[in-house]
Regions:
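Tubulin/FtsZ superfamily GTPase core signature
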Residues: 1-99
Length: 99
């Protein structure tokens, strides 16, 4: 299993998920092994309970999942929204790749 955690670090609630997607597009990728060998990818997008995912963010969340899934097309992609105390207006992305 290869974990990766990204934080939005935007300090602007309206940009938290777009910033995660931009970060993934620029820097995130499968580099340690051939992505074809993965059988499952788990994606969790977390926000503070006081700043939950809003309706306008759903499309960006879907793009994040699509981007991650596209790196390993044969893998099953499971995803969910979660909560994490202390994130404030930021979002956290947890990605677990497994064989």
């Amino acid at each position: 299993i290869t974990p990766a955690t990204y934080h939005s670090r935007t300090y602007d609630r309206s940009r938290r998920l777009p910033n995660l997607l931009e970060t993934l597009t620029r820097y995130g990728g499968v580099t340690e092994v051939d992505p074809i060998t993965y059988t499952r990818v788990v994606v969790i997008i977390s926000t503070d309970p006081e700043a939950p995912i809003e309706a306008h963010e759903i499309g960006c969340a879907a793009e994040i999942v699509k981007h991650i899934g596209g790196q390993s097309p044969a893998a099953e992609v499971l995803w969910a929204f979660g909560t994490e105390e202390g994130l404030g207006d930021e979002a956290e992305l947890l990605v677990e790749w497994s064989y």
